[in-house]
A protein has these predicted regions:
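Extracellular adhesion/carbohydrate-recognition regions
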Residues: 1-72, 105, 109, 117-122, ...
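An exposed tryptophan-centered "aromatic clamp" motif
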Residues: 58-73, 77-138, 147-152
């Protein structure tokens, strides 16, 4: 639910009000922000400003994302595509302005193979630099960029 907020990229402040990035960067230390909120026609997605340190297999990625902050997880395949699309609408610049990193790595989604009877060893990753979502072994090591549905 969007609550009549215009599509764009925002920073959630201490009381969880959404501040436009260009207003946020006027603060004394804009790098205190830990996340951005991507508002689209599909909803409001809160995204960590950088990948978690290290690499993870699929199960480790799910655990690490959940431990980042309450309510966080790896993105769905669809959210990963939304993040890629938003890179061309200012998402990477927003990350940089708050001391984060562009969303260009190869990262885990939250989605394993939907047919575990066929193959229980695979899951989906997204390639942030190109926007591809592909199938990969759950045992490979990839990045984690935690996300959450934004809640006020």
């Amino acid at each position: 639910m969007k609550n009549n907020i215009e599509n764009g990229i925002y920073i959630p402040e201490e009381q969880r009000n959404l501040i436009p990035v260009d207003e946020w960067v006027k603060r004394e230390d804009p790098t205190t922000a830990q996340t951005v909120v991507l508002v689209t026609d599909f909803g409001m997605l809160e995204i960590a400003k950088e990948d978690l340190p290290g690499g993870f297999n699929f199960e480790g990625a799910q655990k690490a994302a959940a431990e980042y902050r309450k309510g966080f997880r790896c993105p769905t395949r669809h959210e990963a595509i939304e993040m890629y699309d938003a890179r061309f609408r200012g998402l990477d610049e927003a990350f940089k302005k708050i001391g984060g990193e562009p969303a260009t790595t190869i990262g885990w989604t939250s989605e394993a193979d939907p047919d575990p009877e066929f193959n229980s060893y695979g899951a989906f990753i997204y390639i942030g630099i190109s926007g591809y979502v592909i199938y990969n072994s759950k045992y490979n090591t990839n990045a984690v960029r935690p996300v959450s549905a934004f809640k006020k």
